[in-house]
């Protein structure tokens, strides 16, 4: 882990689809929960209802399955709270309405640190991933100032300042977290997504290789890497 990073009391991951968080940062979150008791909230923007090649499965059935799988994956590492915004898979747009939704979730759950997709990542071709990252960052900025979405503050909800952001799926990492003791829990979380990963041979071995390769930069047994942004 470098540079020096204080593990937060509260963290939130904001991401496009069920399973994005488990690929991106579940090993780090599992480590924080285990070592420091960090309270973690997941905010899933879309329902992932297009994530099937089976013509017999309806979008509504897929959405229900993927929400259930994401809850199981989160619970496998100790996540306590889940927010499902229910947007259409593959159709996210960077709108003020979505920014307001994310802003409200941040104000309600009050994380110290937010994880999200890196919207600047080179060759990030999935539009939902780009929009999720932008909307999360836009929401972080909006949540801290009372003149953004002031209607949210009339019922006792208060503005909230996120102090740090960690971007996963980045090509430009500047911080690495040791997940040597939690890589198996990361794999267990990913295995909960049976509709997406069921039956893939060698999956666990590939995940361990990926974590080991990521950690090699800092001579860690296994790691996840992020772009770290400290907010003024």
Summary of predicted features, one role per range:
Residues 1-12, 93-232:
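Metal-dependent de-N-acetylase/amidase catalytic core
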Residues 1-109:
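Active-site rim/loop-helix segments in enzyme catalytic domains that contact anionic ligands
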């Amino acid at each position: 882990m470098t540079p020096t990073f204080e593990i937060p009391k509260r963290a939130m991951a904001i991401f496009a689809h069920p399973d994005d968080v488990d690929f991106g940062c579940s090993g780090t979150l599992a480590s924080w929960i285990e070592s420091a008791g960090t309270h973690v909230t997941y905010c899933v923007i879309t329902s992932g209802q297009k994530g099937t090649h089976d013509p017999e499965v309806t979008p509504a059935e897929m959405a229900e399955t993927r929400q259930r799988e994401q809850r199981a994956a989160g619970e496998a590492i100790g996540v306590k709270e889940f927010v499902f915004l229910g947007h259409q898979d593959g159709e996210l747009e960077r709108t003020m309405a979505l920014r307001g939704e994310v802003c409200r979730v941040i104000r309600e759950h009050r994380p110290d640190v937010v994880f999200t997709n890196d919207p600047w990542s080179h060759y990030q071709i999935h539009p939902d991933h780009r929009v999720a990252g932008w909307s999360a960052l836009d929401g972080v900025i909006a949540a801290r100032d009372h003149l953004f979405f002031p209607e949210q503050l009339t019922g006792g909800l208060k503005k909230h300042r996120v102090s740090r952001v960690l971007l996963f799926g980045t090509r430009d990492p500047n911080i690495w977290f040791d997940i040597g003791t939690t890589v198996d829990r990361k794999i267990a979380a990913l295995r909960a997504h049976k509709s997406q990963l069921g039956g893939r041979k060698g999956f666990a071995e590939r995940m361990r290789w990926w974590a080991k390769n990521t950690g090699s930069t800092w001579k860690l047994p296994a790691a996840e890497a992020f772009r770290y942004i400290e907010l003024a």
